[in-house]
Amino acid sequence: MAHFNQNFLDSIERDLPSHLSMEDFIAYSNKPLRLSIRVNTLKISHDNFIDLMTPKGWHFEPIPWCKDGFWVTLTQEIQLGNTIEHLQGLFYIQEASSMLPPTALFEPLEVAVAAENTEDDGSDDFSNKIVLDMASAPGSKTTQIAALMKNQGLLIANEYSASRVKVLHANVARMGVANCALTHFDARVFGEYMFETFDSILLDAPCSGEGTIRKDPDALKNWDNNDDKGIVETQKALIESAFLALKVGGSLVYSTCALSRQENQDVCHHLKSLYGDAVEFGSLATLFPQADKACTEEGFLHVWPQIYDSEGFFVAKIYKTSAVERQLPEPRKQKNFPFTLAKPKQVEELAQYFRDSFSISLPDNAQVMVRDLEFWLFPSPVIPLIGKMRYQRIGIKLADALKKGYKVRHEAVLALSSPTRFELSDEQAKEFLMGRDISLLEKGKPQGEVIVSYASNPLGVAKHLGNKLKNNLPRDLVKDKIALYSHN
C-alpha cells in the first residue's frame, strides 16, 4: 500500500482539477500498475509481434496514445526481461504514460505533412531531421523516438549521469538503433553549444517523481514541498536551454512524471514570460481519443492516475515561432576528433563484404567513418555537427579490419536488416544467448560467418564450422539465465 505524506495529499488537493476526486486519486495510486510494453517496429511490425506472442499466452490491449504500445496480460509467470524476444530487442517494457512524450513530439499531423512533402511513401520523412532527447537514460523514450524516425536523420541522446550512459547505450544497441549519437553533458549546455540546431527536442525533465507512486509505494513517504524548489530551478534552466537549442519553427516537448503545477505548468509559463510571442503552446487535446479528459486550459496534458489507469504524467508541446537572441558567443570548436571519412575504395570493399557475407546493403543515408582499424556507420546529419561538442559514441560499429577481410560487429547485425539467416529453435536460441556453441544434427560444408536468428529476427553472429555453430556473442551480452515459455 502506498505511503502518503499528509503534506503531499494537501498539495494534490490544491492542484487536482475540480472534476476529479481525491478518493479516486488515492484508490488508483494504491492499485498495481498494468504491465505495458512497446513493440520495436525497427525490427518487427506490431501485427507480426502479436501473431508471434499470442500462442505464448499474451493478451493485448492497445494503448490509445501509442500505436505500438499495449497493456499485456500473460497466462504464465515469466521474467520478461530474460525472454529471447526481449533480449533480441523485439519489445521494450515501458510504462504506458511514458509513451506519451514521443507521441506528442511527432504527432500524426506533422508526420502526415512530412509524408505529403515527399515523393515516396513518407519513409524518409526524417532523413534530414535533427532531434534531441535531453535526458535519455535508460532509453525507453529514446528508442521510441528512433522507431518513429524509422532510423532516419539524427537523434542525439544525452544523459548527465555517467553510470546511466552505459545502460542507455545497451538499450539503444539492443533495439537496433542506428541513427543515434550519445552525449554526456549537463543538458543546460545545449542552448550554448547547439544554438537553434534541432528540429525537435524532448525534455523529459528530472522531477520529484510523484506520478511513480504506483511503481514505488514508498516514493512519497518523506515528501517535502521545499525539496522541489531546487528541482524547479533546474527544470527552468533546462527548458530555457532547450528553447535556445531549438530551430525557429521547431517543436519542444516538456514532460515530467511529477503531478504539481509548480514543476509543470509553471515551468512552461516561465519560458513564455522570458520569450513572449516566440513561445507558442500547442494543444494536445486531439492527440488521441479522449485526450481532452487530461487537457489543461493551455492545451497541456496533465495525466492523473485515475484518468487512464496509468502513472501520473505531464506533457506540454511548445513551438518556437521566431528567432531569439543568443545568450553567449559561439564556443570554439572541439579538436582532435578521432574519426575520418572512409575513402571510396574502403567503402566499396566493406559494402562488398556485407553483401557477399550477409546479403546486407549498407544504407545510403549514412556515412562510413574510420578510426584505426575500425569501421563505423554515422548518420549523415551528424557530419556538420562534428566539433560543436564531444560525443560519447556515434552511430554503430560495423566491422574491424583484419589482415585479410573483416570481422562484423554484433551491433551492426542487430541494426541492419538481412534476409539471409540461420534460424534457431527455442532451445538453440537459449543456448546461443548463454554463450554456448550450437551442435548441428546434419554435418555440412563450413559456411564461415553466419547471422543466427530466432523468429526471423537476428540474435547475433556465429561461425559455421560444418558440425557446429561457434558462438561469437560478445561476452558482456552472455546471460546466465534465459526464460522460455512452457508449451501447453
From Swiss-Prot:
Source organism: Shewanella pealeana (strain ATCC 700345 / ANG-SQ1)
Per the entry, what this protein does is: Specifically methylates the cytosine at position 1407 (m5C1407) of 16S rRNA.
- A Pfam family reported for this protein in Swiss-Prot or TrEMBL: Methyltr_RsmB-F
Under the heading PANTHER family, the entry gives:
28S RRNA (CYTOSINE(4447)-C(5))-METHYLTRANSFERASE-RELATED, NOP2 YEAST -RELATED NOL1/NOP2/FMU SUN DOMAIN-CONTAINING
Enzymatic class: transferase
Positions annotated as active site in the UniProt record: C257
Quote the record's binding site residues for S-adenosyl-L-methionine: A135, S136, A137, P138, G139, S140, K141, E159, D186, D204
Q: Which cysteines are joined by disulfide bonds?
A: none
What does the record list as GO biological process?
A: rRNA base methylation
**Name of this protein:** Ribosomal RNA small subunit methyltransferase F
What the entry lists under Gene3D superfamilies is as follows:
3.10.450.720, Vaccinia Virus protein VP39 (3.40.50.150)
Q: Give the E.C. number(s).
A: 2.1.1.178
Q: A single Gene Ontology molecular function, please?
A: RNA binding
